[in-house]
Structure formats: structure tokens, C-alpha cells
């Protein structure tokens, strides 16, 4: 993908994919970067708040299920299991099944073609994902810590902010990374909810390089490479935190 971005369109089409270019050219990368600068900014504006809000609210939801599951009331525990099952099922609902009613809702709210509208739509899908992932990390926190804090008169919000969230921080970072990657690569939601070219996200903008009356293959390879910069950077610089989160999940034991 990187190599073919340095080729001319004819060479990218006719030469083997892994063959080095006969003459290096930055024309494709420069042209594509100028075209994708705005979509890249749009994606960052949408993805960053989506990931943080989804992970944070998902963590709060996971803590709510955690406290219900350890309640002295058998009814509360049953309700917790039922709600958690519904949240888990929600993560398997395909985007296509809900985009029509979701689009109607966003149009009626007057937020179509806005950052708020696309963030709102993504939150609907990624908050359940955040709750599902964070529940696995919060469930290994010793129950005795929560009970001791409650005996001292600490409220649930303070327990969550001062005890639960810090102890589950590896899981929070792992969830954050996962949602960033998923929302960055999301294609269907921005394709349906954004109609103005100036508001396009990078996932939709890259698709515009194919089809039509022809395909400039060197530009397509360059666009795919530029669009992958953010996910690659996250894995390079934050990948170790993702691994730590998985290790913490595998090594933790509830009390």
C-alpha cells in the first residue's frame, strides 16, 4: 500500500503490487493529503469525543450492573442480569437495521449534517460496547473495597470516580482504543448521516477514490495509507496499554 502510493497510476496498475516503483513520486500523496485534510479533521472532531464519552458512560453503566449483581436483593441481581443481557445483545444489532429510524430521529432533531448529529448516532452504538467491555474489567474489582467505602458513607459517584475508575484504568484505556479504531473505520453511519461534502469523514472520503468513470490506483493506495495513519499511530504508541489491559483482565480475580 505504501509502495504503490509512490508510483504513477499506470505503473500501479500494470506492475506487481510488491514491486518497488521505477521512479519515486510524491504527487499522489501530496494531492490526496490536500483532499483528505478536511475529512481527517472532521474524523478527529467526531471520533475523540465519541470514544471518551462512550468509554466513560459505558464504565458507569458497567459499575451500575456490578453493584446490582452484588445486591442483597435477589430481584435486583436478576434485573441486573437481564439489563446486561439486553446491552450485550444491542452490540450485535447491525447498523443497517437501525439507520432508517435513526436518520428520521436525527432529522426531526435538526442535527443532520452536523458534528453533534454524527456523534449522537455513534454514541448510540458504542456506549453499549463500552459497557460490555468495561464490565469485564470492573467485575474483577474486589467487592470488599466497594463495601468498605459504602460503610464509610461514600456515595456511588465518588466510589466510581475515586476507586472503580482508577482501578479499571487499564480496561478503560483498552476500551478507549477499541472504540477509537471502530469509530474511525465506521463507514455506514457517516455515509448516511452526512450529505455535505465539506462534512465528510475520512472513511467516506477514501471511498470516493474508487468507482465513477475510473480509478486512480496510486491515489487510492495513498488515500488508504493516509487514512490509516491515526489507527497505526494508536497501535504504535498506545498498543502496550491495550496489552496491559488484557493482561490485567486475565490476571484479575474478584473477591
Predicted features and spans:
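A structural signal for multi-pass alpha-helical bundles of membrane permease subunits
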Residues: 1-255
Amino acid at each position: 500500500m505504501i509502495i504503490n502510493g509512490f508510483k504513477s497510476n499506470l505503473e500501479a496498475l500494470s506492475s506487481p503490487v510488491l514491486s518497488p516503483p521505477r521512479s519515486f513520486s510524491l504527487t499522489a500523496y501530496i494531492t490526496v493529503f490536500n483532499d483528505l485534510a478536511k475529512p481527517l479533521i472532521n474524523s478527529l472532531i467526531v471520533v475523540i469525543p465519541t470514544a471518551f464519552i462512550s468509554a466513560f458512560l459505558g464504565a458507569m453503566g458497567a459499575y451500575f450492573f456490578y453493584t446490582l449483581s452484588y445486591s442483597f436483593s435477589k430481584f435486583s441481581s436478576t434485573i441486573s442480569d437481564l439489563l446486561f443481557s439486553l446491552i450485550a445483545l444491542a452490540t450485535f444489532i447491525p447498523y443497517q437495521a437501525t439507520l432508517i429510524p435513526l436518520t428520521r430521529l436525527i432529522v426531526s432533531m435538526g442535527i443532520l449534517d452536523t458534528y453533534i448529529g454524527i456523534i449522537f448516532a455513534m454514541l448510540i452504538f458504542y456506549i453499549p460496547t463500552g459497557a460490555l467491555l468495561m464490565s469485564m474489567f470492573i467485575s474483577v474489582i474486589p467487592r470488599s473495597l466497594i463495601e468498605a467505602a459504602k460503610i464509610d458513607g461514600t456515595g456511588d459517584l465518588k466510589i466510581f470516580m475515586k476507586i472503580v475508575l482508577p482501578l479499571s484504568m487499564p480496561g478503560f484505556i483498552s476500551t478507549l482504543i477499541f472504540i477509537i479504531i471502530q469509530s474511525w473505520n465506521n463507514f455506514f453511519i457517516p455515509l448516511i448521516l452526512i450529505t455535505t461534502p465539506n462534512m465528510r469523514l475520512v472513511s467516506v472520503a477514501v471511498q470516493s477514490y474508487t468507482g465513477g468513470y475510473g480509478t486512480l490506483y496510486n491515489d487510492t493506495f495513498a488515500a488508504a495509507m493516509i487514512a490509516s495513519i491515526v489507527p497505526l499511530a494508536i497501535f504504535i504508541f498506545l498498543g502496550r496499554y491495550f496489552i496491559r489491559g488484557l493482561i490485567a483482565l486475565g490476571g484479575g480475580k474478584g473477591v
